[in-house]
Amino acid sequence: MKTIDLNCDFGESFGVYRLGKEEILPYITSVNIACGFHAGDPLVMRQTVQLAIRHGVAIGAHPGFPDLLGFGRRMMAVSPEEVYAYVVYQIGALAAFVKAEGGVMTHVKPHGALYNMAAKDARISEAIAKAVYDVDPTLILYGLAGSELIRAGQAQGLQTASEVFADRTYQADGSLTPRSDPQAIIADEDEAVKQVLMMVCDRHVRSVQGTAVAIEADTVCLHGDNEQAVRFAKRLHAALQNEGIAIQAMRKETRR
């Protein structure tokens, strides 16, 4: 039976600012929790870990650039050494809360501009993979399907999860269409569901240029920061089940 993980970025509130809907949790299997750099704060991190444990979803760290004002979506001129330190720091912060609450951390998924940079920059992706491995070699590294980050994780000896997006369009080279492009976002829910089923079942996606691009899908990213998020998650969950696809979190491989 085919399986797929449904993941969602979570815990991206901080201070008095609130973002994300708890109602989406019954329809996903993994959460990527902000670690205080692009969003989140210590109290939100702890509360989000508690929420994830209560709902039985897999817990992952979501490290990003230190950029609250830009929500971690702005590119920064950083060295691999800086990226390594950023990632170790943020994984460590979340890991402490997970341990304190009696949970288990399963994965790491970079956020925003760091994620996009790692998709194409081999040195940045290698720094991220090494940081994850050095903290805990059993953690699963999430990255854009077919990206440098997936290759770096595999080369480092990490288990990886190739991620695809429900509401983002793709270029002919398999990269995501930049958010600055009017065609970047799929607003039509029917089209988004159709795209996910194509990627999961047929292992390809239709690019904005009209070409079929081969793609590996281990996990699907759902965005939980808009009004339609819960409705769409529920609908996609049902559509996948109707196709006989099991929805479950990534499982750590047994390593010898």
Curated annotation (Swiss-Prot):
GO terms for molecular function: 5-oxoprolinase (ATP-hydrolyzing) activity; ATP binding. GO terms for biological process: carbohydrate metabolic process. It comes from the Bacteria. The keyword DNA-binding does not apply. InterPro entries: Glyco_hydro/deAcase_b/a-brl, LamB/YcsF/PxpA-like. It catalyses: 5-oxo-L-proline + ATP + 2 H2O = L-glutamate + ADP + phosphate + H(+). It holds the Pfam family LamB_YcsF. Keywords: ATP-binding, Hydrolase, Nucleotide-binding. Forms a complex composed of PxpA, PxpB and PxpC. Catalyzes the cleavage of 5-oxoproline to form L-glutamate coupled to the hydrolysis of ATP to ADP and inorganic phosphate. This is 5-oxoprolinase subunit A. The gene is pxpA.
